[in-house]
Amino acid sequence: MKLWGGRFKSETDKLMEEFNSSISFDIRLLKHDILGSIAHAKGLYKAGVLTEDELNLIEKGLKEILDETNVGEIPNDEDVHSYVERLLTEKIGDVGRKLHTGRSRNDQVATDERLYLRDEIDKIKEDLIKLIDTLKEMAETYKKAIMPGYTHLQRAQPVTFGHHLLAYVEMFKRDLSRLEDMYKRVNVMPLGSGALAGTTFDIDRKYVASLLGFDDITLNSMDGVSDRDFVIEFLSFASITMMHLSRFCEELILWSTKEFDFIEMDDRFSTGSSMMPQKKNPDAAELIRGKTGRVYGDLITILTVMKGLSLAYNKDMQEDKEALFDGIDTLKMSLKVFTEMIKTIKVKTDNMEKAAKYGYMNATDFADYLVSKGIPFRTAHEIAGKVVLYAIERNLAIEDLPLNELKKFSDVIDEDVYEAIDLKNTLKKKKTIGAPTSIQS
């Protein structure tokens, strides 16, 4: 069913119809298109455009379509809007043709997308909270498990695995904050903007918005139909969240190698090789890392679509939906898979602590010890560096060097140095808020 055609002399080319059609992907908006149409019909009734009987007939018909429609084979309509209107007209007759009064597909689809995204935000919020809670529980379990902290992927200073996990909790909390803040900009209704210049019918937009649970209405009709900032903002959020997942996955992949051997992935989230019998591959983590680029692509798609569009609506904007839907689907699945995967890893705490001990990661604490004895930090830093080199050449840890050898570097060094550079003590001595102390981890 076409919703236009009166001014055309010839039929649309079949190739153009196929090229123009969006029903294959915007059918996903069916529920929200119907909900928006029911609210619009009530607005038309309040404005005196529909009689009470007509409203009841339209509402009943739309609800039946929602209950009855099981989209298997993609219908042969231009888009979800024409599909719903065709079904309604077939069901209730010419009264169905009144539904689109005072409405354009331009404000209709913008409303549908906001309704849809609003629901998806609620689901993603639940997934993020579940991930954050999972990481917090694991951090409590491993709050005393010492491991190397890295800069430049080189061993730097000792931390705890619990503290490392809580670093990602902070990232995902920021993601959650972005998601919650975004909701207020998504939850604004453009319906009533018409094609671009409003409508002559006295539709109470705030009344319709209240029926649909919107907090507010858009205030400029041209912006209302052409705004896709909410899609861009969501995909920006999704890209940042996926980036955080990808960083964590990269670490898990590294840690699962024999070269690190800090963790072992569970069989349920690993795969094997068709040729090499010994292989156990961290495919779940690798796929999340790979799909991050896919979500970046979704964001770049809509940014590129929008960058050259004059006001108001342009058909280019049809291309926003597949990017939005793909970004939502990919993020949701990645969050679910990651949460289940991280819960099942085997953490090799002994290997982590061993790596921390033999990485000279107490060198900074050695320098701080010298400072506590009155030596300026720059001098202490140089002395500590020489001690590290001395220990490396002898294949020893700093704490394994005898006191008489340490005294060669400075006569302020005494027996208490060994307590100062003990790994567990170095962690306990960290005093600043946010440091990896047992309380904070």
UniProtKB/Swiss-Prot annotation:
GO-annotated molecular function: argininosuccinate lyase activity
Q: Tell me the organism.
A: Thermoanaerobacter pseudethanolicus (strain ATCC 33223 / 39E)
Protein name, please? Argininosuccinate lyase
Q: In which pathway does it act?
A: Amino-acid biosynthesis; L-arginine biosynthesis; L-arginine from L-ornithine and carbamoyl phosphate: step 3/3
GO BP annotations, alphabetical order: arginine biosynthetic process via ornithine; L-arginine biosynthetic process
| Gene3D superfamilies per record | Fumarase/aspartase (C-terminal domain), Fumarase/aspartase (Central domain), Fumarase/aspartase (N-terminal domain)
Q: Where in the cell is it found?
A: Cytoplasm
- What cystine pairs are annotated? none
According to the record, the segments passing through the membrane are: none
**What is the predominant subcellular site recorded for this chain?**
cytoplasm
CDD domains per the UniProt record, alphabetical: Argininosuccinate_lyase (cd01359)
Give the family this protein belongs to, as stated in its UniProt record.
Belongs to the lyase 1 family. Argininosuccinate lyase subfamily.
Record's GO cellular component terms:
cytosol
Q: Which UniProt keywords apply?
A: Amino-acid biosynthesis, Arginine biosynthesis, Cytoplasm, Lyase
